[in-house]
Structures are given as structure tokens and as C-alpha cells.
Swiss-Prot record:
The keyword Zinc does not apply. Pfam families: ABC_tran. It comes from Lactobacillus acidophilus (strain ATCC 700396 / NCK56 / N2 / NCFM). Its main location: membrane. This is Energy-coupling factor transporter ATP-binding protein EcfA2. Its EC number is 7.-.-.-. Belongs to the ABC transporter superfamily. Energy-coupling factor EcfA family. InterPro entries: AAA+_ATPase, ABC_transporter-like_ATP-bd, ABC_transporter-like_CS, ABC_transpr_CbiO/EcfA_su, ECF_ABC_transporter_ATP-bd, EcfA2, P-loop_NTPase.
Length: 285
């Protein structure tokens, strides 16, 4: 079941001197089981848009259809708990949301809140601890005794233990070292490949190029482009006009004098293949 936004507006502090439009006539449709990147400058409306996916914010105007739910300004909050099991959000620096006495209890909280038994919640917690790289030996420790990176992993495991159909992530790898970042992004990619939709808010264009198959670009509350990474990063004039960077692979390829690439390489593997083809007298295709 696709995600569909139709002419969605969102207004902060309506009918007050602080009134501000956070979303302006936003319409799009996303396919199931896709990996979607949501990009744009700070203040462009990315996080506001993300919070509409599970109705943490409801539209001031327009309609949202998602996992069988029809959301309008009049939708009652009473009907949204099951939606939030199907669509979960991971905010930037999610470790600040930790609150339980032990790592295990913190990860178990989400499944229990949505009806899992003690045994089911424990099994899910242990499963996702392993997947995010947290040793079972830490299960009985306070999450506040862990390193910053470990706390991040615990917080993400707590959301993923709910096993939502749609996982929304706001800069989840911000501040992590390169290896931890790669491992975390690979975890999200594996989750998408297992039959889920992943929506990633990010400023990192390398992650967009490496992982996404669909991109939404926000600017001043408006959706200004919806396309594939290949098409978006191929249009350097458009990127420059909107002050958006491109992946380091594309920048590197453009600096190689006398090398020709028929396609803009999005990943390291594509860049290497393109260089090899040039050295062998063939263009990258």
C-alpha cells in the first residue's frame, strides 16, 4: 500500500502573530518497500513532513493516505495508536529519549506498549540488540552507563523492535564515526530489503546516493523535486541553483581531467568501474 499526500499544508501557531507555514501544498506518492531520502536545507520542512507520516503532526489542510489510514485535519487522535505501530519515527539524537532502568527494559518498552507479551517483548529486544551490535551482556546495565554510540544503538533498537512497516529516520547516523555510520546505514538498508519502507531525512548526499532509490527535495515548505538519485545528481545546474551538494563520487569524477563518464557515478563501486573503463578505453555505462 503506497503512501500518498494530496495538497497537504501545515501551519504552525495558526491565527497568531507567530503563524508560519511549515508545509505548502505538498503532494506526492511513494511506492511500498522503497528507500526514500528526504533532503533540503535546515528549515526547508523535512522534519515537519516526516512528523506527518505517523500523524505526530496532522495536516492543516489536505489528505494523507498511509498504511490504510486516511488522515485529515479532522482525524481524531483516538484512532492513531495502531498507525504508530505501523509507522515509527527515530528522531535525531534518539539517545535523549532513553528512560528505563536497563537496556533490555528500554528496548522492550515499545513492543509491550503495542501489546506484546513479556516473552515476545524480550525476544524482540534481544533480536534487535544483536542486530544493532549491542552485546547481550549489556542487557542488565543502565543505558546511561553506555557510551554515546551505544546509547544511540539502544534507542534505535527500541524503535526497530516494534518492527514497523514504515521506518522514518531523522539523521540517525549524525555524529557517529565512519564505521558505525556504515553499519547503521547497512542495518536500515537490510530492513528495507526485508520488505519495509525506509524514509531517511539527511544532509549527507553520499548516503542518498548509496542507499536511496527515491528522493524528495524540500525548500521553504514546498516539495520542489521528486525523482531518482540518478536524475537529481545528474543535473548539476539544478543542484547549484538550489545550493545542494552532490556526492563526493560525482565531485571526484568531475575533477578527473580527460576522463569521461557516460553516467554520473553515485557510489564508490560505480566510480571505480568508470575509472577502469577509462583506463581500458571504454566509457562507464
Amino acid at each position: 500500500m503506497s503512501i500518498k499526500f494530496k495538497k497537504v499544508d501545515y501551519i504552525y501557531s495558526p491565527e497568531t502573530p507567530m503563524e508560519k507555514k511549515g508545509l505548502d501544498n505538498v503532494s506526492f506518492e511513494l511506492a511500498d518497500n522503497s528507500f526514500v531520502a528526504l533532503i533540503g536545507h535546515t528549515g526547508s520542512g523535512k522534519s515537519t513532513l516526516m512528523q506527518h507520516f505517523n500523524a505526530l503532526l496532522k495536516p492543516s489542510a489536505g489528505v494523507i493516505n498511509i498504511v490504510g489510514y486516511h488522515i485529515t485535519p479532522e482525524t481524531s487522535n483516538k484512532n492513531l495508536k495502531r498507525l504508530r505501530k505501523k509507522v515509527s519515527l527515530v528522531f535525531q539524537f534518539p539517545e535523549v529519549q532513553l528512560f528505563e532502568n536497563t537496556v533490555l527494559e528500554d528496548i522492550e518498552f515499545g513492543p509491550k506498549n503495542f501489546g506484546a507479551t513479556e516473552e515476545e517483548a524480550k525476544n524482540k529486544a534481544l533480536k534487535w540488540m544483536k542486530k544493532v551490535g549491542i552485546s547481550e551482556e549489556l542487557a542488565s546495565k543502565s543505558p546511561f552507563e553506555l557510551s554515546g554510540g551505544q546509547m544511540r544503538r539502544v534507542a534505535i533498537a527500541g524503535v526497530m523492535a516494534i518492527e514497523p512497516q514504515i521506518l522514518c529516520l531523522d539523521e540517525p547516523a549524525a555524529g557517529l564515526d565512519p564505521k558505525s555510520r556504515h553499519d547503521m546505514m547497512q542495518l536500515f538498508l537490510d530492513y528495507q530489503k526485508a520488505g519495509h519502507t525506509v524514509i531517511l531525512v539527511t544532509h549527507n548526499m553520499d548516503d542518498v546516493a548509496e542507499y536511496a532509490n527515491d528522493v524528495l527535495v524540500m525548500e521553504k515548505g514546498k516539495l520542489i523535486k521528486h525523482d531518482t538519485p540518478e536524475n537529481i545528481f545528474a543535473d548539476r545546474k539544478w543542484l547549484k541553483k538550489h545550493n545542494l551538494s552532490e556526492p563526493v563520487t560525482g565531485i571526484f569524477a568531475s575533477e578527473l581531467n580527460n576522463y569521461k563518464f557516460l553516467k554520473n557515478p553515485l557510489t564508490i563501486d560505480q566510480l571505480i568501474d568508470g575509472i577502469k573503463n577509462n583506463l581500458e578505453g571504454e566509457f562507464y555505462e
